Amino acid sequence: MKKIRCLKSFLIAAIPLFALSCSTLKDFGLSPSINFQNVAINSLDLEGITFNCDYSIQNPYPLSFSVKQVSADVLYENTKFTSLSADKGVSVAALGTKNNSFTFKIPYSTILNFSKSASGKKSLPFAISGNASIDLSKIPLMENQTATLPFKKSFEVPVFKPEISLSNPKIVLPSLSEMKNAFTSGGMTVAAAAVAASSILSGSKVSSDIFDNVNMNLKCNFDLNVANSGSAAWKFILKNCSVKTSKNSSAALVDLSAAAKSNTEITSSSGTIPLTATLNTLNAGKFVAQILNKSGENPVFSVESGLSFPELSYAAELPLSYSKEIPLSSFKVSKK
């Protein structure tokens, strides 16, 4: 072993002086190499799964070289699904290692289509196969040479497609006496408070400022519906929910995360998480008036969740976001 190391050192030092061929260097193990480390889920959205591929390229030479291109085919059962290329012009330092990665996306529609012939499998066998082309023109005596470093890595793709929707938005009005008390406490006369409360309970249109200076709480209920169209075992975890008065609002009007603490996980193929938020008219009065009038900008409902696949070795609680405008016309108004 010691002799081989000495011989390598001698050959490297002698490159500028002796006519050594590329094959001679390779005979002594002096050739670039690629280490394709893993394929992992990078992110999820409602369209597909984005995978991340980590790899490194080792340079055994005392001069840097560049990567002409990393190209690969994504395969399903040895049939090409898609091709990709990356890293043209990336430099690898002398006697160094370059760590890098690239991503690709597999749509849920493709996964479910492939699964039709997979006899109910919970995951599908994919592979990524390709090579890295290395430009050796900066290495003495290798000016016209290119090294090709092949790689192949298998990975499992869960058979699933998440579906998230919101249903049954409803605002629950306080009783007549509670509203009258809130209005009078806010400065209205008893007669005016009675008229305002009766008008709201009867479903009449209200002015946008009817709740100004009025301290009153109203319950706002939603159903968050979650489903998995595939056969993979999964776990959906609700992390956070919020509602904004419009899509351009900078801050959440209501934080619903605390309202669902007792029921935030779904492990079956589908399920519903009931959510209840409290709207206080001191800071949400105009929004409540919009709901009652069914007129104005639609609020935006957002969900932050985590997904995991217990039967696969992917990271737990992969983040998945969902955002949807709620038409004001879809809100129901009910009484206590």
Regions found by a protein language model. Give the residues of each.
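C-terminal motif of bacterial Sec signal peptides marking the signal peptidase cleavage site
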Residues: 19-21
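Bacterial N-terminal signal peptides that target proteins for export
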Residues: 2-11
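Terminal connector regions
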Residues: 108-160, 281-333
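Short, solvent-exposed beta-strand/turn "edge" segments of beta-rich domains on protein surfaces
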Residues: 25, 38-50, 58-65, 91-94, ...
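Surface-exposed beta-loop interaction hotspot
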Residues: 141-201
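Intrinsically disordered, low-complexity Pro/Gly/Ser/Thr-rich segments with frequent PxxP/GP/PP motifs
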Residues: 79-113, 247-286
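Solvent-exposed beta-strand/coil patches in large extracellular/periplasmic or lumenal scaffold regions
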Residues: 68-70, 174-265, 271-274
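N-terminal beta-strand/beta-hairpin edge segment
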Residues: 39-41, 51-122, 130-132, 222, ...
